[in-house]
């Protein structure tokens, strides 16, 4: 929407994602042939077992954006997301991720347009933003929920089937966050015959979702933890000719 020299654009939305996975299988033992058809027909039918399973995940999101433009010279944008993931415990299910950017089209200023005719475009921009990550390296679906394994144990000379908690659970698990910083310049010369774009960036990931080793004598698997940080810095440069 435009109001004289001012232009404002607004966007708001919501998203609901649900994923369901199911599998079924049949197992037989005793085959000794490399021929698949022959092997299946000669397998021990009494050893046949069927199995099935699956899992479900869900994510709910709300998001919004506002863009402001004054005389095509001064630009501002703000974004905000709120995401909830079923992978995290209820107390940390929601993550909130803002982002901001601003730009100045120096080439639209009168003191440039009237005095530097060979400069077609000059824009300075600055950005900061934060996003979230819910993925574990092992693609663990329920890192904050107790899971159980099955086995056998001898007791009083008899063999019993058992179920036991296979790992510790971290009820403080939360979103990993990725924070981006960017400073850039865009320039075009001689009616944009030639030009370049240069961006300096810094990307920092905090509270990475990892499994840190624990002592084997504990007898249970390691819990997922927010335990890592990574930082990357660099630049991107592109040069063009039309």
What is the predicted role of each segment?
Residues 1-242:
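Extracellular/periplasmic, surface-exposed regions of secreted and cell-surface proteins
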């Amino acid at each position: 929407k435009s109001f004289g020299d001012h232009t404002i654009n607004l966007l708001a939305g919501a998203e609901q994602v649900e994923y369901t996975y199911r599998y079924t299988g049949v197992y037989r033992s005793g085959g000794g042939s490399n021929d698949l058809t022959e092997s299946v027909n000669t397998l021990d039918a009494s050893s046949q077992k069927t199995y099935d399973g699956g899992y479900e995940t869900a994510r709910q999101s709300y998001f919004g954006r506002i863009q402001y433009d004054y005389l095509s010279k001064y630009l501002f944008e703000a974004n905000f997301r709120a995401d909830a993931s079923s992978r995290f415990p209820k107390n940390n299910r929601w993550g909130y991720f803002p982002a901001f950017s601003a730009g100045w089209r120096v080439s639209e200023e009168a003191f440039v347009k009237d005095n530097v005719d060979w400069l077609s475009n000059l824009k300075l921009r600055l950005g900061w933003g934060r996003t979230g990550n819910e993925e574990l390296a092992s693609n663990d679906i329920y890192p904050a929920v107790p899971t159980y394994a099955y086995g056998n144990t001898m007791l009083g000379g008899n063999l019993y089937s058992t179920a036991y908690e296979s790992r510790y659970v971290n009820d403080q698990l939360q979103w990993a966050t990725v924070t981006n910083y960017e400073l850039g310049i865009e320039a075009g010369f001689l009616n944009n015959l030639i030009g370049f774009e240069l961006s300096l960036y810094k990307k920092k990931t905090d509270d990475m979702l990892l499994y840190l080793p624990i002592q084997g004598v504990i007898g249970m698997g390691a819990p997922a933890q927010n335990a890592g940080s990574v930082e990357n810095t660099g630049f991107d440069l592109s040069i063009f000719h039309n």
